[in-house]
Amino acid sequence: MIDFSNLESYTENNRIEVKKAQGTLPNSIWETYSSFANTLGGIILLGVAETKNKSLVPIGLSDPEKLIKDFWYIINNQNKININILTSSDVFIQEINGKSIVVINVPRAQRFYKPVYINGNPVSGTYRRNGEGDYHVNNEELKEMYREANVKAQDIMIIEAMDTSLLCSDSINSYRQRMKLSRPGHIWEGLSDEVFLMKLGAAGIGADGKIHPTAAGLLMFGYESDIVRKFPNYFLDYREDYDNSTRWTDRIQSSSGDWSGNVYDFYFRVYNKLQQDIKVPFKLEGNMRIDDTPVHMAIREALANCIINADYYGRQGLVVIKTKDSILLSNPGDFRIELDAAKSGGYSDPRNSTLMKMFNLIDIGERAGSGIPSIYYIWEKQGLNEPYFRQSFEPNRITLVLPITKDDDKKSAIKIGDKKSAIKSAKIDRIIEYLTDHAEAKASELAEYSGLKASRVRDYLKFLVEEGTVTAEGSNRNRIYKLKS
């Protein structure tokens, strides 16, 4: 929440919008309501103006109670707004220096309620928010919102235009062998491939009474050439970028044509690359050496999470990049739950629940929302810099960065390439959170808030400035940082 005693230090940004609202509600308030609800949430301030230098100043409202009454009347009119996601505590009067303003706290809408639109028309009335203000969503973003709102998982759909003979038998045989090792004596062991695929959720009976692959079955066991017929934007990409003088040093692409190109085979090809540089301490269990470590488990979880939660209709594909400083896993799609809830664990809303079930049956991936918390816990126990997420829009995209260096630059649990330390990692979310609530801050304040050294925080701030998320003003000890408005 905003520090109202220090309102002049704030500027409009992707989470704050001000309206003068003198005498009546401005029509643009509903565009902002829609944009905040469909993006990350935000705060609308009525009775506040923006000065020439972009700072905020209260100008007050003559009758704030009437504005609130009008606001509730309109927001509950479905001809104007398709859904009201606010509660009574989200709208209130705030006194600042003897002036009354109205505060409207708009939460991020749950996926079941999106799109939040105005004037009865989702095509022309759906908005989102970026650093430059409210904007009309494009057709691709609107379609994604409707897909996400569906209670059924995307990957359970039966694809009647294809039959199971199109699936890769080598991938199916490999999966069945892994499941036999993970779950010896399982009741499905003796089933034919076709019946096994139906039990697994990889195939189902269509309206024509015949057996066809599901979307999950096609993604898991299909060939890339068939997958792109259903998911035109489907693309899997793994790169190793160790040398700045070359574009990449190793690469795996689903479209290369020399392997199946499905997500099952991609997972194991990529995991084998990622785990090659993990240092394994000498440990025996009985007479057998144990080569698995918590870091191995965390990387498996992160890779599975990326595959399971990707929106395969989305643009730019699924990308995994390994550098000497970090492992980056990026997938198309928006967060389906709040990031803080995902980090806390206990709740899961996977985009592709059938894919999750398939990986779970071969002991890959966690259930009950424990995957992301376990990644953070393992990274902390190893003394590595904290993982962080980046979320972007137009198109929607989630990126998880796993730093593989330590704050003190001591020898890492993972050694990749040379020993050059990484700086593009840390508590990015906490820095952005603090700047949202406090409008501006010095590196020393952010260091105290995040528990990191000031020098480390300055490195992260430099990264955020280069990325365009944060702006810096002043020099040396007087330098302050703000979210880009």
Q: Which stretches of residues belong to each language-model region?
A:
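Conserved N-terminal catalytic/coupling substructures associated with nucleotide/phosphate chemistry
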Residues: 1-296, 301-406, 443, 452, ...
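Short, cationic-aromatic polyanion-contact patches
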Residues: 421-427, 475-485
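Short amphipathic alpha-helical interface segments
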Residues: 424-441
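The alpha-helix within a helix-turn-helix
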Residues: 447
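A short, conserved structural fragment
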Residues: 465-474
